[in-house]
Amino acid sequence: MTGFSNKAIVIDGRGHLLGRLAAVIAKVLLEGNKVVVVRCEQLNISGNFFRNKLKFMSFLRKRCNVNPARGPFHFRAPSKILWKTVRGMIPHKTERGKDALRRLRSYDGCPPPYDNRRRVVVPAALRVFCLKPGRKYCHVGRLSHEVGWKYREVVRKLEDKRKFKAVHKVAYERKLKKITKDAGAKVSKATAPFTAVIQSYGYN
């Protein structure tokens, strides 16, 4: 994930630890890259669910006594929780930090056009690499749902629909590939002289 690119890096959030992924994203954003994170509801947090919920409920009690509408603002959606975590790792009050934060997009589920884009993972932030087997962890989606996020079922339905379409698309592409291969084999004898001429010019 080194080097500058105008094309956005699409990260699949599933199975990553929230803080470690946010640290990597913050660094990449400050280098000038664009980052898109999908499936934020499947991010993980180390520690058992009960402790993490207590921490979040404590955070919900933080407010301005004079006028609570001034903030702090308590985001419930997993995509916004990731966004705010990244913001805390960026000098977001400077112009450089503001520009970096504008290059970040985070989504719950995997909306178009990113469902057809190649998605990457960050090995340094994967839970299976970072936590010892048997250590407790929880999902950001579950935490969000229990503190007021209303769209867990909607995102689940859309994800099921997307996965169903993806399976059928792969099956169709395999079938098409096989048909094309069989058709090529059938006409290979008839096209042999032409193929020889093409290959003599260095084309395969």
Curated annotation (Swiss-Prot):
Molecular function GO terms recorded: mRNA binding; structural constituent of ribosome
Offer a single GO CC term for the protein: cytosolic large ribosomal subunit
Matching entries from InterPro entries are given as: Ribosomal_uL13 (IPR005822), Ribosomal_uL13_euk/arc (IPR005755), Ribosomal_uL13_sf (IPR036899)
Family annotation (Pfam families): Ribosomal_L13
Superkingdom assignment = Eukaryota
Keyword Translocase tagged: no
Report the family membership.
Belongs to the universal ribosomal protein uL13 family.
Name this protein carries in UniProt: Large ribosomal subunit protein uL13
Organism listed in the record? Choristoneura parallela (Spotted fireworm moth)
